[in-house]
Amino acid sequence: MTSREDLVYLSKLAEQSERYEEMVQYMKQVAEMGTELSVEERNLISVAYKNVVGSRRASWRIISSLEQKEQAKGNTQRVELIKTYRAKIEQELSQKCDDVLKIITEFLLKNSTSIESKVFFKKMEGDYYRYYAEFTVDEKRKEVADKSLAAYQEATDTAASLVPTHPIRLGLALNFSVFYYEIMNDADKACQLAKEAFDEAIQKLDEVPEESYKDSTLIMQLLRDNLTLWTSDMGDDE
């Protein structure tokens, strides 16, 4: 059996060589050891799944865009081909999302004792149910969107005991606001969430420890960018 230390090292090798499927396998073995993950291990498992799922999310978006173009041209034969191909990508996405969500609920959350760890993995649960909602429809979409909302809400309640400038709390607010904007089509709620997180953090900016200053300010910038984009979109809609 490979030691935890070696699995973490192999995971880093896989990351550096952009072999993310293998990175996932190494970090899954670490998670299944049944003890709380360190900050480094937490970030490694997050990066591994983000890349494995992210590449397929990007593929799905490209294919969906091409499908719309062919539909507009009236190319029914091509549309059928694209639909079959899109279904293949959706099946892969479903498998990957199911895989990460199982690891989160069965191991990562159960073994989390620190507030940071609990918020990190509850946010991650919200993220993967959100990704699920991007490519599903009807009842399935409603089911995963509800689960995403519940996970984000629980993470937000727990994160209240972290300082407003904490990168995990800020990252959660960023993703939760994106959930409202993209999945719930609720621009008002998205803006309210992003603005609150940004305003609370800016008041405490002078208290941010040096080691997390860069991370905190980067996420704050992303919150502000989204706010600018969303408010201008809302203006256009009016």
Curated annotation (Swiss-Prot):
Domain of life where this protein originates: Eukaryota
Family: Belongs to the 14-3-3 family.
CDD domains with a match to the protein in the record: 14-3-3
Protein name: 14-3-3 protein 2
Purpose: Probable adapter protein.
Lineage: Eukaryota, Amoebozoa, Evosea, Archamoebae, Mastigamoebida
InterPro entries, A to Z: 14-3-3, 14-3-3_CS, 14-3-3_dom_sf, 14-3-3_domain
Biological processes, Gene Ontology terms: protein localization; signal transduction
Protein species of origin: Entamoeba histolytica (strain ATCC 30459 / HM-1:IMSS / ABRM)
GO cellular component, one term: cytoplasm
Coiled-coil regions, chain positions: none
Pfam families reported for this sequence: 14-3-3 (PF00244)
